[in-house]
Structures are given as C-alpha cells and as structure tokens.
C-alpha cells in the first residue's frame, strides 16, 4: 500500500511518535505501530492477520486467465461481493500487489468513520470516500462528483475497487445494488457506454467461515423485533475487530473477466435495450455482475461437524429475548445462499450456451 501525507493533521509528536489521533488503533492489537515509519509497512500486518486467522488466501481465476490479466493491465474496476468491512479490499490489494504490482484505488463509505483514526487510516491508503446519508440534492451532487472522479481515474488506466452494495449482505445473498451502479455511471454518455468505460471485472470472495456470522444473525433478530432498529457506530467497529481477529478457514478471491464482451453481445442482439427505462437497464447489468460473482464462488463441502459449529456460533449471541430457532435458521441461511446462487448461475450458463 502507498500512504499519503494528510495536510493539516498532526501525526507525530516531538519524539516522532504517533499522536493521540491514532490511540484507538490499539483496538486492532497493533500497538507496535508507534511511528509513521512503522505505519508505512502495514502490508506485513495483513500477512500476519492472514497467517493467524486463515488456512490460506488463494487468488484464483474463472475463464480465460490471459484475458483477465489483459483487463488488469489496462485498468480494471473490481466489483466484489461484500464479506468483511476491512479485509475485502485490503487482502485484494495485497494479492494484486504481490501478483501484478498494482494497487487499486479503494472506495469506502463515510458511514464507517466512527472514530478519527479510521478516517485517517483510510485517507492514508489509496482510498476515496463514498459519501452517504445526505439529503436527496446533496446525494445527487456527491454521486456526480464521485462519478467524475472515477472516470478521471479510469481515463488514466487506474484500477479501482468497490463493493457491489452498501453494507454487507447479512444473509450472504449477494446482489448488486442498482443505486451503486447508477452512482458510478452518471454522465453525458449513454448508460451502457458509461458501463463499458468502467471495465467492470467482478471478483468473488469466499470465506469458509465468516467470523461475523453470529453478529449478523443477532442484527437480523434485532431488526425483526424492531423495524426501526439501527446500528450504532460502535457496532461497525465491533464488526471490524471481529472480522479481523476471527477465524475464517480457507479464503478464495476469484477474478472473473470483464463484463464488457457480454454487454456488447447483448446490445448487438437487442439494440432496443438502449431505449429501456433506466431501472431496467440497471437491472440488466446488475444481473450480469451477479452471475459472474455467483459463478466464481468457491463451494466448500460441509463436514459432519458443521452442525456443531452452528451451535457454537448460536451460543455466542447475547440477546434478552433470544429466538434460537430464528437465529439458527439465519446462520444456516448465510452458508446456504452462496451455494444456491452458484447453482442458479450454473443453470443459467448451461441454458444459454
């Protein structure tokens, strides 16, 4: 990773140690990051986390590897499913840097800036901020600004990472959010031309075990019992810490080819699609992205001890009115949905071949 100087922020004290802006970073058990020089070598930290919490992280490919590598060479827009708040983009950056010597620019929502050190950490990295939670007019202006910035990066052949949706899919039913795609394609050109200019290359992220599964199930019951329930800032921080520290088993990042040839073939066969309402055009592209991601899942076989694993996660959930039957089903659902979506994508592929 490359870290950049932040203007008007005092990072070092007189003894060349980090200021109090970074005191909360100890929550991540990285108290040895005492100086900026230490901070600049955060990549080894990602390796340490990988060794301690996984049985290996593998970079895999779906389809023509040479074509995927050509897409990367010319700058790719990596769009992934969203499993972990911190590590999805961090480990992808590590894998791409080790294999291809590139570092994608990373989009992150400002809703995660619960503490000052998180914002500073983000701005040190090759990150840009996706502003959320504003009024309708401000949201539109923010989207236009973001779209222009992304187009600028793409015009320079830079690679970019963004999750397919705002927030993680609690039930692991990974579907691209049309509003995210719309935000990326604001401009004077035709919608499909804007999508093609992005050069979207979907990436599938699969964890054998999700360390945040019990937290997600807990949130689903809280939301069920009180539809007005909203996460607090500290809930996201707790998810970050659990996601980083928790055991994940095997982890696979699978790169898939650019969706551009598929879009171009679709428009050749159906030129009338350019005249469809915007929400229909968005859904057509979202469906293509989803199929790529679903096809790229690594499907792990579950052994006889999986039921015991689910019960152990259920035991970690603390709620005053704990609905064990509901929570157990939500936990099973998280691990069932990727396999179901993978099978649906395979069926679609076989039907349309």
Predicted regions and their residues:
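Membrane-anchoring hydrophobic helices of lipid-metabolizing enzymes
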Residues: 1-76, 82-93, 97, 119, ...
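Short, flexible loop segments at the rims of nucleotide/cofactor-binding pockets, characterized by
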Residues: 51-55, 106, 137-141
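Structural motif
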Residues: 77-79, 107, 129, 161-163
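Glycine-/small-residue-rich active-site loops that bind phosphorylated ligands and cofactors
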Residues: 83-85, 113-114, 135-138, 168-169
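Short helix/loop capping segments that flank catalytic or ligand/cofactor-binding pockets
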Residues: 87-89, 115-118, 171-172, 211
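A short alpha->loop->secondary-structure connector
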Residues: 96-104
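Conserved nucleotide-cofactor-binding alpha/beta core module
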Residues: 105-133, 140
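Non-catalytic C-terminal accessory region of glycerolipid acyltransferases
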Residues: 138-353
């Amino acid at each position: 990773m490359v870290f950049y100087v932040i203007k008007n922020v005092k990072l070092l004290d007189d003894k060349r140690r980090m200021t109090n802006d970074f005191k909360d970073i100890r929550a991540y058990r990285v108290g040895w990051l005492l100086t900026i020089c230490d901070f600049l070598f955060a990549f080894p930290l990602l390796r340490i986390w990988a060794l301690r919490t996984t049985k290996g992280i593998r970079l895999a490919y779906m389809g023509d590897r040479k074509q995927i590598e050509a897409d990367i060479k010319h700058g790719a827009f990596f769009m992934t499913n969203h499993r972990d708040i911190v590590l999805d983009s961090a480990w992808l950056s590590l894998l791409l840097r080790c294999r291809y010597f590139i570092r994608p620019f990373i989009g992150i929502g400002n809703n995660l800036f619960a503490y000052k050190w998180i914002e500073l950490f983000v701005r040190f990295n090759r990150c840009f901020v996706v502003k959320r939670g504003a009024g309708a007019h401000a949201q539109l202006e923010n989207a236009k600004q973001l779209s222009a910035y992304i187009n600028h990066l793409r015009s320079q052949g830079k690679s970019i990472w963004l999750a397919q949706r705002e927030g993680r899919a609690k039930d692991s039913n990974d579907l691209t959010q049309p509003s995210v795609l719309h935000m990326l394609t604001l401009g004077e050109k035709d919608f499909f031309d804007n999508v093609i200019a992005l050069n979207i290359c979907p990436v599938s992220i699969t964890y054998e075990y999700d360390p945040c599964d019990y937290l997600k199930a807990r949130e689903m019951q809280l939301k069920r019992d009180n539809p007005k329930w909203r996460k607090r800032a500290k809930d996201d921080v707790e998810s970050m810490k659990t996601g980083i520290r928790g055991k994940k088993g095997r982890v696979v990042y699978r790169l898939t080819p650019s969706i551009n040839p598929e879009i171009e073939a679709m428009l050749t066969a159906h030129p009338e699609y350019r005249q469809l309402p915007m929400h229909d055009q968005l859904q057509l592209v979202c469906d293509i992205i989803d199929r790529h991601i679903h096809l790229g899942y690594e499907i792990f076989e579950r052994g006889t001890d999986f039921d015991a694993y689910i019960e152990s996660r259920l035991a970690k959930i603390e709620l005053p009115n704990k609905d064990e039957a509901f929570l157990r089903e939500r936990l099973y659902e998280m691990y069932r949905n990727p396999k179901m979506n993978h099978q649906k994508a395979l069926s679609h592929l076989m039907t349309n071949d």
